[in-house]
Regions:
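Long, hydrophobic/aromatic-enriched structural stretches that serve as scaffold segments
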Residues: 1-54
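Residues that define the transmembrane beta-barrel architecture of outer-membrane proteins
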Residues: 17-21, 36, 76-82, 103-105, ...
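Transmembrane beta-barrel domains of outer membrane proteins
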Residues: 26-28, 85-89, 125-129, 202-208, ...
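Transmembrane beta-strands of outer-membrane beta-barrel proteins
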Residues: 36-42, 82, 96-99, 103-111, ...
Length: 243
């Protein structure tokens, strides 16, 4: 993350420079209608996160301007976070039409706790398309479980190929956000005042061949802190393969 303006000195009332390099381990227990996901993420902020070098590489690759203020990034700190998510299959929205066209949906709630995020919320995703097969409408931009179907599906495929569109909406209440509030165990400046509630919605498209999927989407988030000029738009690009 970087502020909106480029400068070599700290810019208050804007997002601080911060990166977090993480490694996650996820347990997913599921049946045909419910699923529980528990993920542990360990990581580090500061120079060990490699955020500066990663951003400079991507900006150079695409011919974009560099941001010079990484000397002011939040200090290095070991991070640890637990993410719990409970999924519900919405069978009432599962419909099968002629020629292989289908709809499906899921809802979920989640609770996260640790040094990076302390928050809770819920959301819903809805899909419509051709030959959905044994894939799912899960399309989160956070966590590792978005790559795995959260339910045990037994749907028949009418072709090796499939395609779909999706829409998604979610809301969460945020008590702590390291990226806005600063590090927990090391002193860091307070740059912004965050909002306690954040909304998110998005849409996208997916293409499936047998057990592999390519997904692209755009997700929009309401302002996360009071001085933020506009909402965020995050692009999602995922390549999935189910074994």
């Amino acid at each position: 993350y970087t502020p909106e303006q480029k400068a070599t000195y700290p810019i208050y009332n804007q997002h601080p420079y911060v990166g977090n390099l993480t490694l996650g381990l996820t347990s997913l227990v599921k049946n045909e209608d419910r699923a529980n996901s528990l993920e542990l993420q360990l990581g580090t902020t500061g120079t060990n996160s490699l955020a500066k070098g990663s951003q400079h590489f991507i900006h150079k690759l695409w011919g974009m301007e560099q941001w010079p203020g990484w000397a002011n990034q939040l200090p290095g700190e070991i991070t640890a976070n637990l993410f719990f998510k409970r999924y519900y299959r919405l069978r009432g929205l599962e419909k099968r039409y002629g020629s292989g066209f289908e709809t499906d949906a899921l809802a979920y709630w989640h609770a996260d706790a640790g040094t990076v995020k302390v928050q809770a919320g819920g959301g819903m995703s809805f899909r419509f398309g051709y030959n959905l097969g044994n894939t799912s409408p899960e399309n989160s931009i956070r966590g590792a479980t978005s790559a795995a179907p959260p339910f045990v599906y037994n749907r028949m495929s009418v072709s090796n190929w499939g395609y779909y569109g999706y829409i998604h909406a979610a809301v969460r209440a945020v008590a702590h956000d390291l990226y806005l509030d600063g590090t927990v165990f090391r002193s860091s400046p307070k740059y912004v005042n965050k909002y306690p509630v954040v909304g998110e919605w998005g849409y996208g498209f997916g293409l499936r061949y047998k057990r592999s999927e390519l997904l692209f989407g755009l997700h929009y988030m309401t302002k996360e802190y009071t001085q933020q000029e506009s909402m965020q738009c995050v692009g999602v690009l995922q390549l999935r393969h189910t074994f």
